[in-house]
């Protein structure tokens, strides 16, 4: 049985520690010389997140942090412990069933260079470019040097998807997969996790890959970005990956540290969205949508139908389930969402209604997407949704249909971005097909 080591971590008890060195022992919430409170777990600088009350039991005031309560309470009374990081060399061997494309090899070499030079890098990669496989050589290089490696994403769904592929490829590595409900199994030298799990690591990781960096909640939460820094060693490399970087994100990198990857690994262009006017009415069955879905079934295509509102989706579901017995809906608040997605992969649901929970990380062959009320979606979401199609070698094309009640700038920008990436891929010689 493997002994779990808690290196470079914040722990609440020494009970399970063995040979780890404790570098901090004290309250979880402390006050600096200027009277400002600081949380050892999340580090929030916002003083309104700290609440002070008088404890009758201990007969003294106690201040606790409200910002990270869901990860366990930090206060000015109970002691916590931070352990020193440790390193362990491994072979980092991995297996791929195919050879990297020219573009993937190009990105892979830049990742290794960034790790060697302890620099940050942004991979601006088209959806389906094969980002996961681009990471492998960098992971191997880091582990052979004894570096601690983390791969993080803001979304649980993406973490689960990536972890399956990486564990399958790195069979000789002890990999911890951490998200809500999943705890550490090994020594934390190679971790795949949601970003929130990094709150528990301190000065530990030499290399962190951040997938879908633009996704909620990371893009909207500077505190989570600070968490990446706190979880990193004094010298580190952060590899950011996204298909839809914001202008704010792009400005954070030097031009030479932005690697644009406009082509998919199979050298075929990303399907370009089609626009169709359709005034959606969730409270009744609409003949156009019914016939469209029937045609999808006849063509033996799997169809994701995206909605921007859960309520509207569930109202529509009640009407269309009468015609499609295997039709289900999935959203972030759905307790059965993981089971439904697995059933979708198994071919049990040829049509599924979904919110943007499936806009990222989900891949399968013979997949088309339809967006209901596309005028209400942001550009980044539309690009991500379009990127669900044509990802597999046996099925490189697909339908991307934006049903709208009036064309918006976001729709136009999404279509333009996709066409520009396809054109750039041609110019670089990384695409075979003409547009």
Predicted regions and their residues:
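Conserved helicase ATPase core of P-loop NTP-dependent helicases/translocases
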Residues: 160, 173-187, 328-355
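Conserved RecA-like helicase motor core of SF1/SF2 enzymes
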Residues: 212-215, 341, 345-397, 404-409
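Conserved strand-helix element at the start of the C-terminal RecA-like helicase core
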Residues: 124-132, 142, 147-162, 286, ...
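Conserved segment of the helicase C-terminal RecA-like domain
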Residues: 233-248, 388-417
């Amino acid at each position: 049985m493997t002994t779990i080591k808690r290196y470079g971590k914040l722990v609440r008890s020494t009970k399970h520690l063995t040979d780890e060195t404790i570098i901090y022992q004290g309250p979880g919430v402390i006050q600096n010389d200027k009277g400002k409170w600081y949380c050892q777990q999340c580090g929030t600088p916002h003083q309104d997140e700290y609440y002070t009350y008088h404890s009758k039991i201990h007969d003294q005031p106690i201040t606790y942090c409200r910002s990270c309560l869901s990860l366990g309470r930090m206060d000015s009374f109970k002691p916590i412990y931070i352990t020193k990081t440790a390193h362990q060399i491994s072979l980092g061997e991995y297996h791929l069933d195919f050879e990297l494309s020219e573009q993937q090899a190009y990105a892979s070499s830049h990742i290794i260079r960034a790790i060697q030079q302890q620099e940050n890098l942004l991979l601006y990669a088209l959806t389906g470019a094969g980002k996961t496989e681009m990471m492998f050589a960098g992971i191997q290089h880091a582990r052979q040097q004894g570096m601690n490696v983390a791969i993080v994403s803001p979304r649980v769904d993406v973490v689960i998807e990536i972890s399956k592929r990486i564990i399958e490829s790195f069979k000789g590595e002890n990999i911890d997969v951490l998200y809500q409900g999943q705890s550490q199994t090994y020594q934390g030298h190679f971790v795949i996790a949601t970003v929130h799990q990094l709150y528990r690591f301190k000065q530990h990781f030499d290399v962190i890959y951040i997938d879908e960096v633009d996704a909620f909640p990371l893009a909207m939460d500077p505190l989570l970005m600070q968490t990446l820094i706190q979880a990193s060693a004094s010298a580190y490399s952060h590899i950011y990956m996204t298909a839809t970087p914001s202008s704010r994100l792009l400005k954070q990198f030097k031009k030479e540290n932005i690697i644009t990857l406009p082509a998919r690994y199979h050298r075929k262009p990303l399907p370009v969205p089609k626009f169709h006017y359709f005034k959606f009415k969730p409270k009744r069955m609409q003949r156009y949508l019914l016939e469209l879905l029937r045609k999808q079934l006849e063509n033996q295509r799997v169809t994701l139908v995206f909605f921007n509102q859960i309520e509207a989706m569930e109202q529509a579901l009640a009407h269309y389930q009468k015609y499609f017995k295997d039709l289900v809906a999935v959203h972030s608040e759905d307790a059965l969402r993981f089971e439904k997605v697995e059933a979708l992969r198994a071919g049990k649901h040829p049509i599924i209604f979904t919110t943007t929970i499936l806009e990222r990380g989900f891949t399968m062959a013979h997949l088309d997407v339809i967006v209901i009320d596309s005028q209400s979606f942001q550009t980044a979401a539309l690009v991500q949704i379009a990127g669900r199609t044509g990802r597999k070698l046996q099925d490189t094309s697909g339908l991307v249909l934006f049903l709208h009640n009036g064309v918006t700038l976001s729709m136009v920008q999404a279509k333009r971005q996709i066409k520009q990436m396809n054109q750039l891929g041609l110019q670089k010689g990384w695409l075979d097909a003409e547009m």
